[in-house]
Amino acid sequence: MTTVYYDQDVKTDALQGKKIAVVGYGSQGHAHAQNLKDNGYDVVIGIRPGRSFDKAKEDGFDVFPVAEAVKQADVIMVLLPDEIQGDVYKNEIEPNLEKHNALAFAHGFNIHFGVIQPPADVDVFLVAPKGPGHLVRRTFVEGSAVPSLFGIQQDASGQARNIALSYAKGIGATRAGVIETTFKEETETDLFGEQAVLCGGVSKLIQSGFETLVEAGYQPELAYFEVLHEMKLIVDLMYEGGTENVRYSISNTAEFGDYVSGPRVITPDVKENMKAVLTDIQNGNFSNRFIEDNKNGFKEFYKLREEQHGHQIEKVGRELREMMPFIKSKSIEK
């Protein structure tokens, strides 16, 4: 049975009197740091010089190189991209850890797959908001929150659980509810969701639909509208009320087509392929491939990215979005 923790369930403020170093000031970093600061905690930022360093200064934080921030802190929350956490930990965090420090993460990748192996005398915990940083911050300011996960990997001090829950409350997460998990469960489910459904699955489904229509002689512009542009309408309905809300909101024609044609596209073979993806995540094949490619300068990653950038659906989409000024441009600068 899933247990959800709320504000009233956090009986002890285990962060009281402790200094918190937030390492990184990107999407999650700025939200965690500002929420904690607004709740009265002593927060410093650890980051390398650059735009984020300057932004943290502008936002009123004491900002230090990572090693200096860690030296001062009792709790260290690492909010850096997965691929750079290992080097930053080895060179700047690990040498400055002290007994009974608490080392925290918002995603379990590097702990679960052994890239980062903390000493046995420090606490290791996870607090993972289920939403992007700007939403974590905005909902906090509005008086609500984004639901989050928390988990304990090591409890050297005997207080890791209290510290993790206090941290979750500090960023506002217990207003909405915090679900207990493990580093293993959070990591494997997160990667599976990204690869099989949210990113890999959806993007390939859209591409295949686009190609099917274009190859059948339909105009690429119409294909784009039908399989990509209108996706937002469906996702918004699903986000607000699940698949039942989608089916309630669409036409009877669309709903009937959902029932009779959906299983023809997503066949039992697709589920078997999903199981294979999950197996590659569980046994470390995916993480090893990602880690090795990172060591080799992301040659495979950048090659795959460039191939996808050149797909016809991307070219058509860029042209059509010029016709829609009501869409706030989020195009990536090259």
Curated annotation (Swiss-Prot):
Binding-site positions, Mg(2+) 2: D190, E226, E230
Positions of Mg(2+) 1 binding: D190, E194
InterPro entries according to UniProt: 6-PGluconate_DH-like_C_sf, KARI, KARI_C, KARI_N, KARI_prok, NAD(P)-bd_dom_sf
A Pfam family this chain is assigned to: KARI_C
Top-rank taxon, per record: Bacteria
Cofactor annotation remark: Binds 2 magnesium ions per subunit.
Keyword Lyase in record: no
Protein name: Ketol-acid reductoisomerase (NADP(+))
Organism: Staphylococcus aureus (strain MSSA476)
Keywords: Amino-acid biosynthesis, Branched-chain amino acid biosynthesis, Magnesium, Metal-binding, NADP, Oxidoreductase
High-level lineage: Bacteria, Bacillati, Bacillota, Bacilli, Bacillales
Cofactor(s) listed: Mg(2+)
Active site: residue positions: H107
KARI C-terminal knotted domain: residues covered: 182-327
PROSITE patterns the record matches: KARI_C (PS51851), KARI_N (PS51850)
Catalytic activity: (2R)-2,3-dihydroxy-3-methylbutanoate + NADP(+) = (2S)-2-acetolactate + NADPH + H(+); (2R,3R)-2,3-dihydroxy-3-methylpentanoate + NADP(+) = (S)-2-ethyl-2-hydroxy-3-oxobutanoate + NADPH + H(+)
Entry GO CC: cytosol
Role this protein plays: Involved in the biosynthesis of branched-chain amino acids (BCAA). Catalyzes an alkyl-migration followed by a ketol-acid reduction of (S)-2-acetolactate (S2AL) to yield (R)-2,3-dihydroxy-isovalerate. In the isomerase reaction, S2AL is rearranged via a Mg-dependent methyl migration to produce 3-hydroxy-3-methyl-2-ketobutyrate (HMKB). In the reductase reaction, this 2-ketoacid undergoes a metal-dependent reduction by NADPH to yield (R)-2,3-dihydroxy-isovalerate.
GO molecular function: ketol-acid reductoisomerase activity; magnesium ion binding; NADP binding
Family: Belongs to the ketol-acid reductoisomerase family.
PANTHER family in UniProt: KETOL-ACID REDUCTOISOMERASE, MITOCHONDRIAL
Domain KARI N-terminal Rossmann span(s) in chain numbering: 1-181
EC number: 1.1.1.86
Protein's GO biological process: isoleucine biosynthetic process; L-valine biosynthetic process
Binding site for NADP(+): Y25, G26, S27, Q28, R48, S52, D82, E83, I84, Q85, G133
Gene from which this protein is expressed: ilvC
Binding site for substrate: S251
SUPFAM superfamilies membership: 6-phosphogluconate dehydrogenase C-terminal domain-like, NAD(P)-binding Rossmann-fold domains
